C-alpha cells in the first residue's frame, strides 16, 4: 500500500471496538533501494513508546500502561503511526482475561502488519524513567556552511587523521512528515569508530535535515548510509529519539555491528 492511502492527514473516526485491520504497513524496500549495498541498513531496531494504552480486564475495569514496542529493522514493513494510534484506541473497550492475553494479541497483530516478530513490553505509568544523553554534544559548534536539505558533501574527516572511537549527539535534528509536512523533532546519537570525523561537519549535516520530508526510520537510515559512505568508519551506530506525537514516540536505531546495539532510552523531551 502507498503512503497516500494511509490515514495520515485525514479526518478519521476513532474505533470503539477491536479493529486490527486498521493497521497500515508501509514497505521499507523502496526507500532502501539506493542503500542496498550498505552494511547495517537492515540491522537494528525501531523502538516505539506508546503512552496511551488502555484495555478492560476480565471484570470490565479499565487498565492503563505505557508500552515499548520493539520492531526489527529487518522487517519488510514499518507501521504507519496514525494507524497504530487508532489500533490502540480500538482496544480501549475490549476485555481481556489477563494482561498477558492483551500483550499476546497486540504482538500477534503488529507482527502480522510488520511481517516480522514484534515485541511489546508494558510499564506501570510511573516506571518508565528518563535518561540523560551520554557522549559529546556537538550543538555549540559553528558549522562552516549550512544547507536547507540533506547534503552528504557536508560530511568531512578531521584534518588530524586520528583514529578514534567516540559517541556524539545533537538535539538539533528536525525533519518533516512526508504526508502532513508537520515537523518531527529528535535527538540523534552517532557512535563512530575509525578516522576522526569533523564534528562541525556532522552538525552541519544534521541541521541540513530541517526541511527534509521523510519518516523517522527513513531519516535515520539516510544518515547512517551517508556517514558510512562518506566517512567510511570501521563501525557505526545511528540512533534517533524523536519527540512524542499523538501519544507515540519513535526511536529508530541502525548499527553496522550488532554488538553496538544500545539499550532503548527515553529522554526528557519525550
From Swiss-Prot:
EC identifiers of the protein: 1.7.1.13
Domain of life: Bacteria
Reaction catalysis annotation: 7-aminomethyl-7-carbaguanine + 2 NADP(+) = 7-cyano-7-deazaguanine + 2 NADPH + 3 H(+)
Residues involved in substrate binding: 79-81, 216-217
Enzyme class: oxidoreductase
Active site: 177 (thioimide intermediate), 184 (proton donor)
Binding, NADPH: 81-82, 245-246
Keyword annotations of the record: Cytoplasm, NADP, Oxidoreductase, Queuosine biosynthesis
Metabolic or biological pathway, per its Swiss-Prot or TrEMBL entry: tRNA modification; tRNA-queuosine biosynthesis
GO biological process: queuosine biosynthetic process; tRNA modification
Entry-linked Pfam families: QueF, QueF_N
Any GO MF annotation of the entry: preQ1 synthase activity
Cellular component, GO annotation: cytoplasm
Cellular compartments annotated: Cytoplasm
Matches recorded under InterPro entries: GTP-CH-I_C/QueF, NADPH_dep_7-cyano-7-deazaG_red, QueF, QueF_N, QueF_type2
Family statement: Belongs to the GTP cyclohydrolase I family. QueF type 2 subfamily.
Stored NCBIfam families: QueF (TIGR03138)
Function recorded in the entry: Catalyzes the NADPH-dependent reduction of 7-cyano-7-deazaguanine (preQ0) to 7-aminomethyl-7-deazaguanine (preQ1).
Subunit structure: Homodimer.
Protein name, per record: NADPH-dependent 7-cyano-7-deazaguanine reductase
Organism: Acinetobacter baumannii (strain SDF)
Taxon lineage: Bacteria, Pseudomonadati, Pseudomonadota, Gammaproteobacteria, Moraxellales
Amino acid at each position: 500500500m502507498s503512503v497516500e492511502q494511509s490515514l495520515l492527514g485525514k479526518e478519521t473516526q476513532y474505533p470503539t471496538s477491536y479493529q486490527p485491520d486498521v493497521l497500515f504497513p508501509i514497505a521499507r524496500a523502496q526507500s532502501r533501494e539506493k542503500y542496498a549495498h550498505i552494511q547495517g541498513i537492515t540491522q537494528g531496531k525501531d523502538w516505539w513508546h506508546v503512552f496511551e494504552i488502555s484495555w478492560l480486564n476480565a471484570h470490565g475495569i479499565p487498565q492503563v500502561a505505557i508500552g515499548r514496542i520493539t520492531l526489527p529493522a529487518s522487517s519488510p514493513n514499518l507501521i504507519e503511526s496514525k494507524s497504530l494510534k487508532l489500533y490502540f484506541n480500538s482496544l480501549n473497550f475490549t476485555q481481556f482475561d489477563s494482561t498477558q492475553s492483551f500483550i499476546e494479541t497486540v504482538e500477534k497483530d503488529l507482527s502480522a502488519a510488520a511481517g516480522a516478530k514484534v515485541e511489546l513490553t508494558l510499564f506501570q505509568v510511573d516506571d518508565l524513567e528518563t535518561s540523560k544523553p551520554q557522549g559529546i554534544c556537538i550543538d555549540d559548534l559553528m558549522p562552516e556552511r549550512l544547507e536547507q536539505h540533506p547534503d552528504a558533501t557536508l560530511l568531512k574527516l578531521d584534518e588530524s587523521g586520528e583514529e578514534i572511537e567516540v559517541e556524539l549527539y545533537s538535539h538539533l535534528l528536525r525533519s518533516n512528515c512526508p504526508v502532513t509536512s508537520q515537523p518531527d523533532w529528535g535527538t540523534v546519537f552517532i557512535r563512530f569508530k575509525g578516522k576522526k570525523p569533523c564534528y562541525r561537519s556532522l552538525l552541519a549535516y544534521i541541521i541540513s535535515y530541517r526541511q527534509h520530508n521523510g519518516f523517522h526510520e527513513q531519516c535515520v537510515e539516510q544518515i547512517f548510509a551517508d556517514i558510512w559512505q562518506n566517512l567510511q568508519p570501521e563501525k557505526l551506530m545511528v540512533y534517533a529519539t524523536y519527540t512524542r506525537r499523538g501519544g507515540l514516540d519513535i526511536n529508530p536505531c541502525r548499527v553496522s555491528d550488532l554488538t553496538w546495539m544500545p539499550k532503548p532510552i527515553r529522554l526528557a523531551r519525550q
